Amino acid sequence: MRVRGALQAAALLASALWASPLLAKDHPDFKTTKLDTQPNNLNYFQGSDTILFHDPHKANLWRSDDAGATWSVVKDIPDGKVARLYMHDFDPKRAFAITDGRKHYRTTDQGKTWKKFEINAEWDTERYDILHFHATDPDRIIFNGLNCLGFLCEEVSLYTIDGFDTPAKPLRPDTLGCWWAKSNALFTTGDSDLDKDRILCIIMGVDSIFTEDRRLVISDDFFKADKEGNIQEFEPNLAGDKPVRGVVNVAAVKRYFMVATTSANTDEMALFISTDTKKWQRAMFPNAHDDHDHKIVQEAYTVLESTNYSIQLNVMTGSKSQPMGIMFTSNYDGTYFTENLEYTNLNMYGHVDFEKIAGIQGIFLVNKVDNGKDVDEKPSTKKKLVSEITFDDGRTFEKVTADGKRIHLHSVTELNNVGRVFSSPAPGLVMANGNTGDYLEDYWDANLYVSDDAGKTWKKALKGPHKYEFGDQGSILVAVRDSKEEDVSEISYSLDHGENWVEEKLPDDLKIQPWILTTTPDSTTLQFVLIGKAKGAWQVIHIDFEALHEATCKDSDMEEWHARVDKDGESTCIMGHTQTFPRRKKDAKCFLKKEFKLAEVETKDCDCTDQDYECDYSFERNDKGNCVSKGPIPIPEGACKDGDKNGKFMGTSGYRKIPGNTCKDTKDTKDKYKDVERSCGDGIGAPPEEATGELQQVDTKGKFGHWTQWEKHYLERGESSSDSSETIIMRGKNRTVDDSGPKAGPIWRTTDHGKTWEKIDFFKDEEVISIVPHPTVKDWVFFLTEGKKLIYTPDRGKRFRTFDVPQPADLEAAANGIFPLIFHPDKPNWLIWLGKKCESKNDCYRVAYGTKDGERWETLARDVYRCEFTGAEAYGRKYANRALEQILCLKHEKEGASDSALQLVSSNDWFNKDEKVRLKDAKEFATMAEFIVVATEDTEKKTLRAHASLDGGLYSEAKFPFGFEVPHQHAYTVLDSSTHAVNLFVATKMEGDKSLGTILKSNSNGTSYVVSVKNVNCDQYFYVDFEKMVGLEGVALVNVVANPDAKSSAPQKLQTKITHNDGAQWAYLPTPSKDEFGRFPCSSSGTEKCALHIQGYTQRRDRGKTYSSEGAVGVMFGWGNVGDSLGPLKDADTFMTTDAGITWKRVKKGRWNWALGDQGSIIVMVPIRGQKTDTLEYSLDQGATWKKHTFSKEKVDIWDLTTTRSGNSQNFLIWGENSDGLFTTKIDFTKFTDHVCKYDPENLGKSDYQIFSPKHPLQPDGCLFGHVSQYLRKKPGLKCFNDFRLDPLYSKQNCTCTRSDFECDFNYELDNHGQCALVKGLKPQDPKLWCKEHPDEIEYYEPTGYRRIPLTTCQGGADFEKQAAVHPCPGHEDDFERKHRISGIAIFFAVVLPVAAASAIGWWVYRNWDGKFGQIRLGEQGASTMEFFDADRPWVKYPVIALSAVVALAGAMPLVLAAIWRTAKNTAQRFGVGGGGRGGWSRLDGGGASRTFRTRDSFARGRGDYTIVDEDEGELLGEESDEEV
């Protein structure tokens, strides 16, 4: 078997030139070449006898120009330099030898000569498409590589239009791969100029390294920049009218361009198709069946060998350990797919048992899993594979038979050769290894079978499995027995289509273990190459059958072979036409000897019949064979535009002609399959019902029973989700102190946001102690039991699967925050399980196990405290040593000694061979964005030390600022940080619930810190009064202790402060204006004596709630009061802001719960729990006006008000209790809208959106962190709704750099004039450290006292870091001298011209000055050379320090997945209080548990807000608040 083409497992070999036979022989000629190492990546130059292969061990290239008879090492390339060989995809004379450096080699004459060329980048060992070729111009090539500085790497793309005759040029920054639009000869944009130049690139998101923010851009002039520096490019509207984020892959398939996208919260991918790169459409798949899904998930789809007229796709279903799939075929446009076959067989690499019969249209072989449903339900079930064949491109399938018996064939998933698996261009000739019987058996029990009618009938050829090839267009078949040993001494060949076989001994009594048997890709020659292993060496055996026959075939030796015939032998139709090939007769004694020329096919179209049609999109065949509707159907463009659901359009009959079928329409088929009249209401994207303004509600009462709390989990959708459902999984629970009474009720599921609820019967006999949604892929939910069984759903509760973990969970550790199940941020199947293993009753320890599929578990480490995945695709691309598989563990130094000190160990290979101790005396660690922060203990001083790492390997100790004295550091809390710096809270005063501390801000590598804000309030568990405004950069609230030095008996005086520039300055909140509820006790713009103060995180009962929503940018709510300090919680009112905290208003007297929907255009409020009500209030204009709605006939106690965390839904859910027990009420606002909002940048008056740009009250230019951000906000009062895939961030424009973009450097602090001055008694940090940390840099600057804020994106302007003297780095003095050498012309421009200009200006001033020296006019400001540094200027008065904000939706990586256990809210012993819909937690223990980490909001986008690292005793936290939810 062989895999040629798509799999690219190895390239193909060629054969020798024909020569006129001088003398007939009765055996082939052999020539043998012995090699020390295994040949790799053998490639023929198309249409020739020239072969190349790569020797990876000695890093050389070998070449043969006589079909493998003789070989020599390529001499033009230095010995030992070749790392990879690439053949040009479209030029049969070109190849490229890539080295490990930046100097590479190319040939344009089939390897005779090689020329060196240089690329200003290194090759990326992890990607295959390093070189991307233009389909029609062989000189146009894109190089996708890397630029690395130490362990920091960035991807780059360069291009050449002259085949590297001149140096390649970079395309644009931040690329993740680029492709020519003309990547396939069949593809065209419809414009020859665009075909020539158009390039598509995947680029990084704006200030983001995360996959879900990546974008696709297109350029037609190589991404050139204009005079202002703007790159000439555009984002294509993949979604029809708007671009789509999260682009992960681009592929050119025949006449189609395919783009795959992903998004947060789901592993589903969206597939967009274009036939010209101008107009794009999302690929549509039919509705899912009951037993399998139709969505495309990450790493779970394979583009099969498609045709010129459709795309064939296999979508994986089932588990990774036992993968299966569904095969689909698209329509002509590639947008609507129909199902061909379910339960196709594939392996864990995505290879599918599928192959087309070469050269014949519509025929392919597949293997399917006959017991697929059983395997899907229980992945440990062994697959039973059967083989089938289709002759109508997948519309129908038949059994494969030999002599009347069914046979099954080994296919692509069991490769044992190179090239195509079954067939070759030899017309109708097919070979395969297989067996008779019910199912496919072991490969080594197979026999060789042959078919000469394109797979219709088969016959047994040779006993045992073989490697095989075709020659001379099928005139000769060659096979060699496959073996596990070096015991093969002969080959077999047949000259009559496999009827008879001749054995031929290998020369010199040679015995080999065969590796590959191959010939030219077109199978037109008589020369073959056999490679095998013998006695520790590799034998390359050239086999030449040229002289077996003297004759060259004549016309009388040829026959017309029809691809398909009827019972009378007459040609019948395949795909609407007959196919006839000229072929040598089976018994003819001759060879064709037509080297590199394929047989020409003759086709003739047939009249259409029913067999030429298949079910169209959204239709399936019923039991009678008719195509019936299974879902909405496509509406033609331009139809149903008037919004009338009862309107009509001409739509599909339910049938379509099979794509690629060329049959001629007849009158009968035209009438039978013509379009029919359809109702607009039945179509995809049917017009919605007219907006009536009616508020709908659905009550669910009396079915949930009596419980003391809810446990509920919203399963958020991703932007790439095709499913529009709003799924919630929930159950009632009792918060019991002892074991009396039931702990939890049945598990319920809704897919329509609470309109209907179904009880999940799967759990009828299961005792689930914890429900845990996957933190980054919300389609997956895990259900933990007390034993070894773990239950999960990969599709939001549609199906459930189980697997066993190696050991039960350590429930005691789980109650203390060590969650047993750890997830990988990118790979939902990758899990770590912390199990409790006991040698005896009193001898138990924790073991970490790892799996990639839930079926096979391996021991990672013993005696561990906890482990975490720290590898991620986003960070692995940036930090070379941070592998995707990287795992960190806290592990006891001595196995078996649980009282021994912990050490931080890491592994980049699941602890197979790589295990390194990184830090000793480790106490805890946390991951936050790209940073890994670790606390270690100084055992002598009994204090903690903080360390940080970017790559998981190198850890540097944190340097705290001078004057920040904490004699004994006992607790750190990692706050929600930006993606470029660490926010670290350090407790400075620990007095129970009167504790406080300082927030410190790091530099870009997490090691050097400056003070951001002091005296920040925290509680005894080191939760901090810190609240970030979700979705905005740099806006955060803190509560500070105004009387930090007061006696412990005195009450704390808390005051709220806000930052709009990431901690550069903090200000009090302004008081609202007088409102309908009366006056406030004072009024001001925000002063120490009078301001608005908001209750902080430590006062919050439900710590899963947030004050803002990621979808409603700039909107925030809070409970608080006006005065000189924060008052009691019971006296608080409800306030809100719509402009990111610049102004506030009171919306309700007293405390109300709120929820935001439709990206903030809908606000719903209800009284808090304990205040019975029958009414809710809502606003459709961001709180300007409010309306009431009575939702209940009786007053009820509302426990919670929820909607989706993203804030994109128009539905809300009230959770409460009435006389019948627990109830839910769905509040539905969909009747208020009837179409999707549109943004029209050309006509803002007609646009449904207005632009909101966050401002800083003291920075009028609007620049925050070096840029101006603009967000879309729906105009009030419109009857449109926001698409849930809408990205609120509309644009971001960089500003020039000013003082605001720099903060004080290490050992510098702000003086009284607002300047960064050196701290008295200290020295600046040694600037030579810059050279040490950046070995490729040639120079360093003396310290200026300033450093660039990590978050800023400013460009140009002032650079405060580089305004002092510059010096060469050690070892780079010559480079420095060359860079700074001054020429004579430079001296002229630098000295002579300025002096002359100064003289001229002085003369002009003397003549025109209208005042005298010393005169100052009223109303004028005196000029000063230091005016820029004037202390009153905002950029001087408020230097940016940058706190903890993140770009909208960036969040932070999961900090400590121990927190997920707390998210579960329950253990077998005790259950806590239910959480909220905006990220509410479930946890194992209701109270009394000592916990190591604190983290909240850790499941938003898979990243958390903050985590405590450690406290004095090694367990940071004390008793947990009973009020925590």
UniProtKB/Swiss-Prot annotation:
UniProt family annotation: Belongs to the VPS10-related sortilin family.
Glycosylation sites: 308, 734, 1005, 1294
BNR repeat windows: 62-72, 105-116, 449-460, 493-502, 748-759, 1135-1145, 1178-1188
Function in brief: Functions as a sorting receptor in the Golgi compartment required for the intracellular sorting and delivery of soluble vacuolar proteins, like carboxypeptidase Y (CPY) and proteinase A. Executes multiple rounds of sorting by cycling between the late Golgi and a prevacuolar endosome-like compartment.
Keyword Transmembrane helix annotated: yes
UniProt name for this protein: Vacuolar protein sorting/targeting protein 10
Transmembrane domains' residue ranges: 1385-1405, 1440-1460
SMART domains assigned to the protein according to its UniProt record, in alphabetical order: VPS10
